[in-house]
Amino acid sequence: MHDKILILDFGSQVTQLIARRVRDARVYSEIHPYDCDPEFIRKFIQEQGGKGIILSGGPNSVTEDGSPRAPQIVFELGVPVLGICYGMQTMATQLGGAVASAESLGKAREFGYSEVRAHGHTNLLKGIQDFSTSEGHGILKVWMSHGDSVTALPPAFKLMASTESCPIAGMADEDRRFYAFQFHPEVTHTIQGTAIIERFVHEICHCKPDWVMGDYIAEAVEHIRKQVGDEEVILGLSGGVDSSVAAALIHRAIGDQLTCVFVDHGLLRLNEGDMVMEMFARNLGVKVIRVDAASTFMGKLTGVADPEAKRKIIGKEFVEIFQSESGKIENAKWLAQGTIYPDVIESAGKGKKGAHTIKSHHNVGGLPEDMHLKLLEPLRELFKDEVRELGVALGLPREMVYRHPFPGPGLGVRILGEVKAEFASLLQRADAIFIEELRNTIDEVSQKSWYDLTSQAFAVFLPVKSVGVMGDGRTYEYVVALRAVQTQDFMTAHWAHLPHELLGKVSNRIINEVRGINRVVYDISGKPPATIEWE
């Protein structure tokens, strides 16, 4: 049995990052709603290998009546507890401290970079710092996002960290092994966040670092076999990383009981349909049915400009096609999807009490209530880096596993506004040029291609025209935007600082080789505030 960390979710959009950081430390973690049954929590800790509990952040205020609280049993089981942001505030409130809102303190909400001074030598922070002051105080560079603040420590707690604007930025009761931070150690902006979480799970909770993808394969295969039995499964194959790894994992578990349905909706990357068939049907021996549905999708999307409406239409059409194909497969009872954690968090999916919806994902947002197929989502609890690690462990080729993510709705969410076949054709060719040049351009320092140095890169079609000059003539043609980001987890991302020579070459090639486009721009927005995809 794996040692485990229980994460109680109070509705933060980055709760999954906590789980990712714990798993980075090779410790298994599970996320459950903050108001789950206390008996479940007791069994998780006492019978299922639970070694510690983390309380997440959230959008509520503990100063308001009826705001969420941690089940009291959390503080009675004798295991370490770590509170983060709202988790710190509810811990303080429930254990006898005090919390006040920014408004009542006459302060503004604190959001962004901050430098925190560590106090004393707690077991959690001892020796962890980014730099020290001339007085010898250890300083941490962290990310804050809060309105309320703890104003009085609970009995038996001591001050662990502070800033000028947040005098109690961390607290600790070392006898009970209760710790809490106002800042977010789970986000990459907190430089020592990984070290803090590793210290908590390894040295405070004494968890064994035994969570590896090889173990996950064995467990997932067993679970899939028990779940599916002798029934048939169909999987929507896109050729992207997630659906590819899901197909390989399910095929490992049930072999020919899996049939992949590859829907060519006319919104794929250039020549992608043929490449997908070559990779799966011929190289991996997986049963694949190719469905040419371009005209159907284009018809459904005619006149639709709203991005949420497009996603819902594309998702619904996918499901209907799968249902139709399942009728041709004897005993088909399951629809498999490559849904992963970021899909769920961006959809404010199951378990996200109080979370705010950002955008829906086609895997979780467009499923009809009367769907005749049961859902099989073997990657639902994994982050992108874990999915890639799993793909390698399954023996998939590197070019498949490390291919950049591609959205389920395809170019439907990379063509702003209404989707037209003309726009799709222009975008396919522009995007292919961008990716080709990224693969062919090697960074002198790392000796890696810029494709490998970026986490996701693509072109976006803008349904606006601009004036240009080609030869002696005036042109009035469309604009494409190039987007390239670098990220560790896809929850936050930085725009990639591509070489100007590379961008210039891509722009020249697109304008000269793709008739209908006369202007190329580069997106330099981070996430947040922007999302990675434009729609």
Swiss-Prot record:
Residues 211-403 form the GMPS ATP-PPase domain. InterPro entries: Class_I_gatase-like, GATASE, GMP_synth_C, GMP_synth_GATase, GMP_synthase, GMPS_ATP_PPase_dom, NAD/GMP_synthase, Rossmann-like_a/b/a_fold. It catalyses: XMP + L-glutamine + ATP + H2O = GMP + L-glutamate + AMP + diphosphate + 2 H(+). Pathway: Purine metabolism; GMP biosynthesis; GMP from XMP (L-Gln route): step 1/1. The keyword Nucleotide-binding applies. Its EC number is 6.3.5.2. The keyword ATP-binding applies. Homodimer. PANTHER family: GMP SYNTHASE [GLUTAMINE-HYDROLYZING], GMP SYNTHASE-RELATED. This is GMP synthase [glutamine-hydrolyzing]. It comes from Polynucleobacter asymbioticus (strain DSM 18221 / CIP 109841 / QLW-P1DMWA-1). The lineage of its organism: Bacteria, Pseudomonadati, Pseudomonadota, Betaproteobacteria, Burkholderiales. The gene is guaA.
